[in-house]
């Protein structure tokens, strides 16, 4: 699906035109170790069209670089089901307790979020990219009621 606007000089993409976006999510557990769970998430999307603030889209536009990201995670069930610890008074209200480690943006892609526009003395506008965060680690503790 494309979102284009017809102008005198031809077709110009609208600011929301993203030509493709592909996402993948995979989650599984290790058969010999059912308390462990692994997840993989990948996203690859086309860049959005941008134009300088003082110029119209018809005068000139460009696309941001593609958005790419890969996340992985590993979780372990600490308690749940028939585990002995679940018989203690504090844990009786929980179905299960999980601890997990995630790595966001595993491949450390430098994705562009937006642009800061710098105007020179000749009124030319230059786009300076603002990048999203790089690789991050996340430790989580999850309680299911």
What feature does the model see in each segment?
Residues 1-51:
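Gram-negative outer-membrane beta-barrel transporters
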Residues 7-13, 57-62, 124-129:
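Extracellular loop and loop/strand-boundary signature of outer-membrane beta-barrel proteins
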Residues 15, 27-29, 61-63, 90, ...:
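Residues embedded in well-ordered secondary-structure elements
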Residues 16-22, 66-70, 95, 133-137:
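Residues that define the transmembrane beta-barrel architecture of outer-membrane proteins
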Residues 21-23, 51, 62-67, 123-128:
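Glycine-rich loops and low-complexity Gly/Arg-rich segments
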Residues 22-24, 36-40, 72, 97-101, ...:
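Transmembrane beta-strands of outer-membrane beta-barrel proteins
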Residues 29-75, 84:
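Extracytoplasmic gating/loop element in the C-terminal half of outer-membrane beta-barrel translocons
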Residues 43-53, 76-145:
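C-terminal beta-signal and adjacent terminal beta-strands/loops
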